[in-house]
Every structure is written in structure tokens, then in C-alpha cells.
């Protein structure tokens, strides 16, 4: 942005804003993964999980306190969709084209072609279908509710959850593909098992 003639402070803010959606999704996913892992840790320890001499008790307290005072996961879910829609309305992100393509595809005969032999073809297809599902559900919600959709937080939260899970699935796939390209398939079996 500085190359475009913007002052440094505006460039830094603009750069950070560019990743705000991804940051919001990662924050929700990460903190909820922590909550799940800590809850399971308490379960594994049984009644001892609440006893101070076990480390899991502190992890559980910290995680639980975060859930009580934080409340930002709900805000970040709404922020994810709000910023995405603002980018679409501002012409920075084309949502209408892909949404119309999904709607058109729903009216056509599905492709029952054979699987590609390309690495990760199945995973790529699944992620593509997850994205289509988001566009389909969001499109149906917007068509039915129009401007009232802003007040339908339950629908927005579910759409955000779909987007968060899809973003994380695609991120894992892309990371695994990159690691395999860098190191070779032979040494990357644990990543392939993911």
C-alpha cells in the first residue's frame, strides 16, 4: 500500500484489515479447539481432573474463565460474515458470480464422472463442495429474508461456522500440499495421514 502512495500508518492498517476475516476465523477455531481439548483432558483424568495437583485443573480453569469473560467468538463469527459481505458489496469480492453458478449447477444434471488420479483430488472436491454449500445456504437465506437477515443471528452464526470449518479444512490441505512439495512424499506420511 505504501507503493501506492499511502502513508505508512494507513498502509499498516490496510494490511492488517486485509487479514481480519482470516484472523477472526482462526481465533474462533483455536479457542474452541482449546476448550474441547481441555474438556477432554478433564474427562481423561476423571475426578482427579479438578484436583489442584494435576495440571489439567489449571488448564480447565483458564479455559473456563476465558469462556466467561471473553464472548468474542460470537462477535468474531458475526464479523466474519459482515466483513465478507462488505467486501462483496464494495466490489472487492465476487460472491454473486459463484453463487449464481452454484444455483445453476443445482438445476443441471450432476457429474458422476470418475475420480481423478491426481493427488488430493478427493479432498479438493470436498472443499469445493463445502464452498458450494456455503454459497447455496447463504443465497437461500438472502433470497428468503432479504434485509432481515442481519437480525437472524442463528442463521449468521451457522453460516460463519460453515465458513470457519471450510477455511480450516482448506488451510490444512494447502499446508500439507506445500510440505509435500518441499520435502517429498516419502518423508511426509504423517501429514498425508491427516
Predicted regions and their residues:
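Flavin-dependent oxidoreductase catalytic core characteristic
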Residues: 1-194
Amino acid at each position: 500500500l505504501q507503493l501506492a502512495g499511502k502513508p505508512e500508518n494507513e498502509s499498516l492498517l490496510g494490511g492488517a484489515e486485509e487479514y481480519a476475516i482470516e484472523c477472526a476465523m482462526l481465533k474462533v477455531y483455536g479457542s474452541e479447539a482449546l476448550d474441547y481439548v481441555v474438556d477432554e483432558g478433564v474427562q481423561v483424568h476423571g475426578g482427579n481432573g479438578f484436583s489442584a495437583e494435576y495440571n489439567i485443573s489449571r488448564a480447565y480453569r483458564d479455559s473456563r474463565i476465558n469462556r466467561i469473560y471473553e464472548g468474542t467468538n460470537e462477535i468474531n463469527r458475526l464479523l466474519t460474515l459482515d466483513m465478507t459481505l462488505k467486501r462483496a458489496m464494495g466490489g472487492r469480492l465476487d460472491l454473486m458470480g459463484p453463487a449464481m453458478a452454484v444455483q445453476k449447477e443445482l438445476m443441471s444434471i450432476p457429474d458422476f464422472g470418475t475420480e481423478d488420479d491426481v493427488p488430493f483430488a478427493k479432498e479438493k472436491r470436498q472443499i469445493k463442495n463445502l464452498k458450494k454449500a456455503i454459497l447455496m445456504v447463504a443465497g437461500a437465506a438472502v433470497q428468503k429474508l432479504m434485509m432481515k437477515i442481519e437480525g437472524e443471528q442463528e442463521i449468521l452464526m451457522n453460516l460463519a461456522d460453515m465458513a470457519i470449518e471450510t477455511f480450516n479444512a482448506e488451510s490444512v490441505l494447502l499446508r500439507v500440499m506445500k510440505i509435500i512439495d518441499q520435502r517429498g512424499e516419502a518423508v511426509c506420511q504423517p501429514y498425508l495421514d491427516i
